[in-house]
Amino acid sequence: MIGSESLTVKFAELEFRNPTMLASGFLGISQKFLDRIYRSGAGCLVSKSLSNSPIEGYRNPTVIELDGKSYINAVGLANPGFEAFAREIQANKSPLILSLVGSHQKDFVHMVKRLDKLNILGFEINLSCPHVKKMGMEVGDDLEMVRSIVRQVRVNTPKPFFIKLGVGNIDILKLAEVARDEKASGVTAINTIRAMAINVQTGSPILSNGIGGLSGRSIKPVAIRCVYEISKKLGIPVIGCGGIFTWEDAVEFLLAGASAVQIGSGIGNKGIGVFKSISRGIRNYLENKGFRNVRDIVGLAHRY
């Protein structure tokens, strides 16, 4: 029988007790919730995306549940601003990565400089939120802007940082290549996909913003493809995200080339026990297949 150390993952100068991570989202906004998620079994935590100034976000409705395993959301990147969150996590002892969002290179540089001294593992640079103007994907669709942001973040922190990519107007492989060339530690793939739902009785969009981001089961095949192509063609660390509810989902991402996996929608469907459940399933899979550790299966699908 293999031990718990078989779940340990090491990549980009980081080490987690298991490959499951809290995805950036509504649970990552307070120290209390972050610590609770870590105690519930997550290997690492990612905060909600933080901006230079507080963002109120959109009015309700902001989330649509499609089938229990797929959602469309447009929260509008609501957050208290990075300075308020920095005060919230002053005493942080959990393995935490801060997600940052901005409109310009200077936004990211300012935040990184101020946050770098905190007890955190590193940063995730959100260049792919699909429903907020002048942020996220609108920034990420400009290859030269992405290049400039990644280059300046690298100059201003020695910590690992990952570029969160989505499916937009630019080939995700080109974006990942820029991230690699400008010395990002890796990428997270993928963010939600631009989507919409309309009330057939009223004829109006259901979300207050009209357009939102599709997440959950519906985007998993797209996410698997993106992880597979980035990992196989570029050979950089990839954190997989999109539709992970079970250990089988997580293993599929690992086989595609993900070094770790982020879970968001799965919490809404299965609760915070999903982290331990997935880790237990991965360990049983490794044992049944004769593998020694998670690293043995990362990218195995590249052989075919």
Task: Tell me what each language-model feature is.
Residues 1-96, 101:
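N-terminal capping/small domains of soluble enzymes
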Residues 47-52, 127-133, 186-196, 243-244, ...:
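Glycine-rich phosphate-binding active-site loops on the catalytic face of alpha/beta enzymes
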Residues 70-74, 79, 130-144, 175-232, ...:
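Glycine/Thr-rich beta-alpha phosphate-binding loop at enzyme active sites
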Residues 100-157, 165, 173-185, 189-190, ...:
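Conserved alpha/beta-domain cores
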Residues 25-27, 99-103, 165-171, 220, ...:
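Glycine-rich beta-to-alpha transition loops that act as phosphate-gripper elements at the mouths
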Residues 20-24, 43-47, 96-100, 123-125, ...:
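Hydrophobic faces of well-ordered beta-strands that scaffold small-molecule active sites
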Residues 1-3, 214-235, 245-304:
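Alpha/beta catalytic cores of nucleotide-metabolism and tRNA/nucleoside-modifying enzymes
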Residues 31-36, 107-117, 169-182, 232-234, ...:
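Catalytic cores of alpha/beta
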